[in-house]
Amino acid sequence: MMKKIALGIGVSAMVLLGGCATESSRSVEVPKVASYNTNYQGARSPISVGKFDNRSNYMNGVFSDGVDRLGNQSKTILMTHLQQTGRFNVLDRANMEEIKSEAKMAGKSQQLKGADYVVTGDVTEFGRKEVGDRQLFGILGRGKTQIAYAKVNLNIVNVRTSEVVYSVQGAGEYELSNREVIGFGGTASYDSTLNGKVLDLAIREAVNNLVTGIENGSWKPAQ
């Protein structure tokens, strides 16, 4: 009899737990460069994106597998932000074989454009840290903050002369905080998305500075 009661309680608990499951989703607005959708009447200049390397100490230690994930991620972010400025036609050099194959399948001859300038980039600083605090020796709660910092350099290189005609930098910091009060509240686990967020912020700032340089006449892309 007791076994049947225990079994019934177990089944009821599973049903209740299953009934408590919730699912939610929402779209998140993606930050864009300052010049996105601004009124610009000028011509878009063709520009190519060259190497984007991770020159920081992050993921570059003796135990690194040699794959530059930070640099590859940064290059993808840079191409998107450059295109969204409305000042450039970004030339894709990373998928040449795929583009060639697709053109062949479509029976079309390629008419590739050249660029007078190449943008190269480096992640010069990148780091993460966690800081915590306790209030009244932890009796009133404790907190933990994850902080990610990134700094990038962008260089505009003349393809004919190899001169660096203009340079900009961008830096950003992201943090995630969580506080637990007298045993209540969540704990902030490691959030790997902070890497992408802080890279996006730093590169976006550098691209904004690049556009500002065009607008104040510091450099002029080829028309």
Outline where the language-model segments fall.
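Short, aromatic- and cysteine-enriched interfacial helices/patches
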Residues: 63, 136-140
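Bacterial Sec-type N-terminal signal peptides, specifically the leucine/valine-rich hydrophobic h-region
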Residues: 14-17
